[in-house]
Design a protein with these regions (language model features):
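Glycine-rich, small/acidic residue-mixed loop/short-helix segments
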Residues: 329
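Trp/Phe/Arg-rich N-terminal binding region typifying the photolyase-homology
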Residues: 86-93
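Conserved catalytic cores of phosphodiester-cleaving nucleases, focusing on short active-site segments
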Residues: 275, 307-309, 315-324, 333
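Glycine-rich anion-binding loop/nest that anchors nucleotide
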Residues: 5-9, 89, 319-321
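Anionic group-transfer/hydrolysis microenvironments
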Residues: 90, 289, 306-308, 321, ...
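Long, low-complexity, Lys/Arg-enriched
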Residues: 1-85, 98-272, 277-282, 288-302, ...
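Short Gly/Pro-enriched loop/turn and capping motifs at secondary-structure junctions
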Residues: 94, 323-325, 353-357
Length: 396
């Protein structure tokens, strides 16, 4: 097979999986008009394949979404020009699939499909090379964005340094659980006493009043027990507290400074480490920012995924919430999963609050798993992630 015919699908992975597996010299996409004319989208696909280490010839042919007879005529013309062609019927519209069936019946061209449930390719007609063939491909988080026309941008976290801090994340989260109800005030206090000048490297040494101005005119005093615990687990150093007067300490480094000044960082870092601890993911990224297309400036659309992981050809999208689970957060997560993961992608929302029945029901409707406070407190997150990715059976 030197030529592979792909029935273009709105789910990005359906357009690249068979080409990447069999690596033909030429890929012909029968696609909607907007794709056939979208040079930027086509360049993204070329960039994806280059990133994967090969440069096939890509041909984009506009095809009808609903007229099977027109699609059949196109297929027959392609078959005449490229008699070595094979047909992937994994994606595409109903009309395209109907035409593909007639094409293979008339010409004997090989046809095959991919089963996401089995993660195998199967011979449909005359494609013995694809029969019961296990898909051993593995994609990175960036690959999933690129194949869907997106771009991975730098996020709030330098993922290159996280491996140095892995042993800190569990104690950090245990500290959070102990002081969960006061956590917002604790972080707010640290923010107040550790200001920084714009454009300057923030100082690690902190000195401030014991009581500072809080939100809405309230007063916020140092939580001595929490600060002492942060010192015990070595996130801050040289802690000195003069009750009712002053507090001073030193952040361990700039990274811990950033995490201790952000309410949600503790959960995101804990979720990141949980993904690592499962041992099943080939790539994990904290704070994955994706730009939807090549538009920059005004009109550019980007979103942040708190934690994203990849296991083979299946991505996992994690949303971390240090608050109640809201419908808006569930809807946004579902949109990102569907846009950049497609069918088979997994999504879960992790909350430091108990999940109410309404939110759990909405999550189930959207196919989103829920990991809430009770499972976090009982240390079930690693097990739950394995179950979500079907790497382990659920326990009851």
């Amino acid at each position: 097979m030197e030529t592979l015919i792909e029935l273009y699908d709105e789910r990005a992975i359906e357009n690249i999986l068979a080409p990447d597996m069999f690596r033909p010299q030429r890929i012909i996409y029968l696609c909607p008009g907007e794709i056939a004319q979208d040079r930027k989208r086509q360049e993204k696909l070329k960039a994806f394949f280059r990133r994967r280490g090969w440069t096939p010839e890509l041909i984009f042919m506009e095809a009808s979404l609903f007229k099977a007879d027109r699609i059949l005529r196109q297929l027959l013309a392609i078959g005449e020009k490229y008699p070595d062609c094979a047909l992937d019927v994994t994606g595409g519209s109903d009309a395209a699939l109907f035409a593909a069936g007639m094409f293979t019946a008339q010409t004997g061209a090989p046809a095959f499909t991919y089963s996401r449930k089995k993660n195998r390719f199967y011979d449909i007609s005359g494609a013995g090379f694809a029969d019961d063939l296990y898909c051993d491909l593995s994609y990175s988080v960036e690959d999933f964005f690129l194949m869907a026309g997106g771009t991975l941008l730098p996020g709030r976290v330098d993922n290159g340094i996280l491996s140095k801090y892995l042993e800190d994340f569990d104690p950090f989260f245990s500290c959070f659980l102990r002081f969960r109800r006061d956590w917002t005030d604790i972080i707010s206090y640290i923010q107040r006493i550790s200001p920084a000048e714009y454009g300057q490297i923030p100082p690690l040494l902190v000195q401030g009043n014991y009581t500072v101005k809080g939100d809405h005119g309230a007063r916020n005093s140092a939580n001595e027990a929490a600060l002492q615990e942060l010192a015990r687990i070595c996130l801050i150093q040289d802690l000195t507290i003069v009750r009712d007067e002053s507090v001073s300490f030193r952040f361990r480094d700039q990274n811990t400074r950033a995490w201790l000044r952000d309410v949600g960082s503790v959960l995101e870092l804990y979720a990141y480490k949980a993904c690592i601890d499962t041992g099943i993911f080939n790539d994990v990224i904290s704070s994955a920012v994706v730009r939807w297309d090549d538009t920059v400036g005004h009109g550019s659309v980007s979103n942040e995924i708190d934690v994203m992981a990849a296991r083979g050809v299946i991505p996992l999208f994690l949303s971390c919430k240090a608050c109640d689970i809201r419908t808006e957060a569930l809807n946004e997560l579902a949109i990102l999963r569907d846009r950049f993961g497609g069918k088979g992608a997994k999504a879960a929302i992790i909350s430091t609050e108990p999940c109410n029945a309404a939110a759990r029901h909405r999550a189930a409707q959207l196919g989103i798993a829920v990991i809430d406070l009770e499972e976090l407190k009982s240390g079930q997150i690693v097990h739950r992630l394995k179950v979500i990715m079907k790497a382990q059976k659920a326990s009851f």
